[in-house]
Amino acid sequence: MAQTMLLTANAKVDLRSKESLVERLKPKPLSSFFLPSLPLKYPSASASASSHFTSTTVALFKSKAKAPAKKVVPKPKEKVEDGIFGTSGGIGFTKQNELFVGRVAMIGFAASLLGEAITGKGILAQLNLETGIPIYEAEPLLLFFILFNLLGAIGALEDRGKFIDDPAPPTGLDKAVIPPGKGFKSALGLSEGGPLFEFTKANELFVGRLAQLGIAFSIIGEIITGKGALAQLNFETGVPINEIEPLLLFNIVFFFVAAINPGTGKFVTDEEEE
């Protein structure tokens, strides 16, 4: 009987040791490492408490979110335009084309004034005298010529490009003295190899527009009155032509020189600026 009780006791001890070993081998929750284990009377309650316990992780330092990179939108480049119609090509003349037309108009207007001073006939009568073509047969061409000059004079045919003046020469007292090896033009502030009158191409363009207006209105006036430009001037002002001969000669010479004189500056188009 005593042996049986001893074996039973030993068996109980072994069972307890086995149970404690099984308990040790069971996976424990993470909270058991950070929180002290509390002795609970009922293991089922501790298991349920550990199953309901949740741990929240709070980050002390958060990585700063990067701001999205700004997209740089290239600014659209403005076109070099100066015309009334703004056609950007099409029927639009460049300023260089209009400059050529203005030079032709200056030569034509000066020649018509000189011819009227010699022959006493207007530009249309001179055309009839030189070619023998009656004016009424050339009316369509004449109307086109008048319209073309009027539109060109107000800048309606050109819209592309611009003239850029050359940089101004330096000024000062040191520039008032003629430097060694330089001529008299450099003392006046003029470029040695440049034109004498220092006309810019923009100035020449303006004078060409005036010549276009002069030709157009002299033709219109001659169609209406039958008189040339000088006779119209005499009719409007009452001043005899012989009294304004110096002014007339100056205008003729001025238009001729302005037409053949190369202006300073340069012509820039849209493609060259890009």
UniProtKB/Swiss-Prot annotation:
Transmembrane segments: 104-124, 138-158, 205-225, 240-260
Species: Nicotiana tabacum (Common tobacco)
Location(s) in or outside the cell: Plastid, Chloroplast thylakoid membrane
Main location: plastid
Placement of Sequence repeats on the sequence: 61-166, 167-274
Transit peptide location: 1-66
Record key words, sorted: Chloroplast, Membrane, Photosynthesis, Photosystem II, Plastid, Repeat, Thylakoid, Transit peptide, Transmembrane, Transmembrane helix
Name used for this protein in its record: Photosystem II 22 kDa protein, chloroplastic
Family matches, as SUPFAM superfamilies: Chlorophyll a-b binding protein (SSF103511)
Tagged with keyword Transit peptide: yes
Record function comment: Seems to be involved in non-photochemical quenching, a process maintains the balance between dissipation and utilization of light energy to minimize generation of oxidizing molecules, thereby protecting the plant against photo-oxidative damage.
InterPro entries: Chloroa_b-bind
Transit peptide in keyword set: yes
